[in-house]
Amino acid sequence: MEKFNTHTGLVVPLDVANVDTDQIIPKQFLQKTERVGFGVHLFHDSRYLDHDGTQENPDFVINKPEYKGASILLAGENFGCGSSREHAPWALQEYGFKVIIASSFADIFYGNCINVGLLPIKLTEAEIEQLFKLSPNAQLTLTVDLPNNVVTCGELSFKFSLNEFQQYSLENGVDSVGWTLNKLDTIKAFEEKMPAWQ
């Protein structure tokens, strides 16, 4: 998992509420556990005109030339709802997204994003609407400053928050397993103090 500090990237606006994990990565593509090979299937049913994924839908926003190379996804409310699947953030990340911004996320999806180093940012509905209004007129670029918990766009700035563990995990590139392994000496010392079962 890579450390996250600051990131400046092009925004792709997906102005759709309640995008569920099956829309993000349909179930037929969940047949492996390695974290590779999912980006090509991201938003498959909207992104492609055919079942095989060989003919792109030119009307789907991430296929539009002006959004090629975008690394920040601006989304509608309740993003990532539906069934729990780690493959959804894997697909987003492998496609090239480093940040997802929405007014709300499904809780499990939000946690899965943190676990893989994909930064989910919650802004207010009014702030999200403001960004959506900016995005169609020009290529919108945002800078995300994780240590200071701020998103900037020119003169505009938007604060966001994470809990202490989420902040630590992303800034240090450490997931929950890695965090536990970093505390191994403390865990061993505690266990040595505990009386043995008799």
From Swiss-Prot:
Entry's Gene Ontology cellular component terms: 3-isopropylmalate dehydratase complex
Enzyme class: lyase
EC number in record: 4.2.1.33
Keywords: Amino-acid biosynthesis, Branched-chain amino acid biosynthesis, Leucine biosynthesis, Lyase
Domain of life: Bacteria
Catalytic activity: (2R,3S)-3-isopropylmalate = (2S)-2-isopropylmalate
InterPro entries, per database record: 3-IsopropMal_deHydase_ssu, Aconitase/3IPM_dehydase_swvl, AconitaseA/IPMdHydase_ssu_swvl, IPMI_Swivel, LeuD
Any one GO MF annotation of this record: 3-isopropylmalate dehydratase activity
Pathway participation: Amino-acid biosynthesis; L-leucine biosynthesis; L-leucine from 3-methyl-2-oxobutanoate: step 2/4
Keyword Repressor part of the UniProt annotation: no
Pfam families given in the database record: Aconitase_C
A biological process from GO: L-leucine biosynthetic process
Subunit structure: Heterodimer of LeuC and LeuD.
Family stated for the protein in its record: Belongs to the LeuD family. LeuD type 1 subfamily.
Function: Catalyzes the isomerization between 2-isopropylmalate and 3-isopropylmalate, via the formation of 2-isopropylmaleate.
PANTHER family to which the protein is assigned, alphabetical: 3-ISOPROPYLMALATE DEHYDRATASE SMALL SUBUNIT (PTHR43345:SF5), 3-ISOPROPYLMALATE DEHYDRATASE SMALL SUBUNIT 2-RELATED-RELATED (PTHR43345)
Protein name as annotated: 3-isopropylmalate dehydratase small subunit
Species per Swiss-Prot/TrEMBL record: Colwellia psychrerythraea (strain 34H / ATCC BAA-681) (Vibrio psychroerythus)
Source species taxonomy: Bacteria, Pseudomonadati, Pseudomonadota, Gammaproteobacteria, Alteromonadales
Gene coding for it: leuD
